[in-house]
Amino acid sequence: MLVDFDGSISAIVDDPASARALPAARDALADLIGTFETVAVVSGRPVEFLARAIDVPGLTLVGQYGLERMEDGRAVVDARAEPYLGAVAAAADELEGELPDLLVERKAGVAVTVHWRTSPDRGSAAIEVVDRVASRHGLTAYATKMARELRPPVPADKGTAVELLVDGSSGACFAGDDRGDLDAFAALARLAAAGRLEHAVRIAVGSAEAPAELLAQADVAVDGPPGLVSLLKELAGAATRTPR
């Protein structure tokens, strides 16, 4: 069982640092651990943030779109990203200087995100600046909800993370709400088509900001984080009732 964080088990908030998993989501994930072979959160957030914001022992954490993972309580960065960490830091400095009125989020040195949720009229200008800075530093720009992120140009995304997590499993579910989750959906579809997964379920966590493609590709749609929490609780309850 694999889930996204923001907008899936946590509400979308103006200040990214204040986001926390819904208490009912914590309980449901804790109940699922031991029932599923793997219960994981696959997110664009740093794993140390996820550990604090979710606080569920035994949960597998993959962050930074697959560039970071938690191992034995320690954040481990993909070695392929390390040569670009200096460029990420320099880009963050420039973005803070050029966009002083917007939130520039430094993500444990691995990525940097510019947010305009509280200033929606600044979106176009922010995108122009972010893309220019990305080009100057050899980084890649990605669109997210009311934000744009710079990452190392490394072939890693939620899809590659999901492929590693489900390797050898007979089935997998992934739940997400944003454009970056489409890569996870595509990975499950590829694995199922290749016969590497017997069952693959893609769950769209709907909202007014959810991409149309996400809803179109989903096998199941739920209404926001509360809807996903209800589904997770149903799965946990069904597993408890099923004889072993």
PLM region spans:
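Conserved Rossmann-like nucleotide-cofactor binding loop
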Residues: 8, 47, 180
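Conserved acidic, metal-coordinating active-site core of Asp-based
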Residues: 101-198
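Mg2+-dependent phosphoryl-transfer enzymes with acidic/Ser/Thr/Gly-rich catalytic loops
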Residues: 22, 159-244
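Asp-based phosphoryl-transfer active-site loop
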Residues: 1-15, 41
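Active-site phosphate-binding/coordination module
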Residues: 20-107
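Short, flexible loop segments at the rims of nucleotide/cofactor-binding pockets, characterized by
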Residues: 16-20, 39-40, 149-154
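Short, structured coil segments at secondary-structure junctions
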Residues: 54-57, 137, 198, 216-218
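Proline-centered loop/turn at the N-terminus of a beta-strand
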Residues: 38-40, 60, 140, 171, ...
